[in-house]
A protein has these predicted regions:
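Proteins that catalyze or organize thiol-disulfide redox chemistry
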Residues: 1-51, 58-104
């Protein structure tokens, strides 16, 4: 299960990380977020070279605002601390995997 991070440790966990990080911006009340969660869990188990983290937009408004999160779920791919890709809304597993793999 991806680690939950927030305003206090986003920089260390994502921006200072070398390699690929998938950040799942979500909220506990969001239906599509609940649907995508098990897919993210599966991908984390399959893709050992990628770091997966989750940010609750209600608990971490600073990070959500910094990255312009308007709708959830929003998935952001970071590589070596740079935001290289973003998708909004529910996607099937294979599309999320392809999104990540193009930055590996």
């Amino acid at each position: 299960m991806p680690r939950h991070i927030g305003d206090n440790n986003f920089n260390t966990e994502v921006l200072e990380n070398k390699g690929v990080v998938l950040v799942d911006f979500f909220a506990t009340w969001c239906g599509p977020c609940k649907m995508i969660a098990p897919i993210i869990d599966e991908l984390e188990a399959e893709m050992g070279d990628v770091k997966f983290v989750k940010v609750d937009v209600d608990e971490s408004p600073e990070v959500a605002t910094r990255y312009g999160i308007q709708s959830i779920p929003t998935l952001k791919v970071f590589k070596d601390g740079e935001n290289v890709d973003t998708v909004v809304g529910f996607l099937p597993k294979e599309q999320i995997k392809a999104l990540i793999e193009k930055h590996m």
